[in-house]
Amino acid sequence: MIYTSDKMEEAAVLDAAQLMCAAARTAPKTRGIDNVRTLVLTGDDILALADKMEETDLRLNNGERTFLSRDAGNLRRSKAVVLVGIEKKPYGLNCGYCGFEGCAACVEGKGTCFFCGTDLGIAVSSAVSTAANLRIDCRVMFSIGRCAAEMSYAEGNTIWLGIPLSTSGKNPYFDRK
């Protein structure tokens, strides 16, 4: 049997995406509370998210195209995207690091617990280091996560970051314009 480079690279990207999800899941977390969520999108689901990014760009920027449309173009050239999210809820430490008096005030004021961002960052770092170890091109994009939050991929209030994946002769995420 002959395996073409296209098929092998596509399989490598999906294998990497699985391992990235595992790395995000097993990353250290505040108080050991696991609020991490992961998803992998391919094919038409990538295109739908890219469309959402372009629609959001035009809506937020008075019909002008900005970085959201640029990033949507990067997403369209990706074989897969790993979404890593964290459920937006306080961790019960009442530390006030969020800027509120405590967790109840944070919830009432619709704030974001400091540890949500911390845990999301650690999980994403674990995921992208896995991709790097496997020589899969990737880039962390808040723009993808911003628009993924509008797609209702998960119940509740989730903060997402997107990690598009590629295997091409040149990293498409390197010199974006």
Predicted ranges, named:
Residues 1-177:
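Acidic, surface-exposed loops and disordered segments
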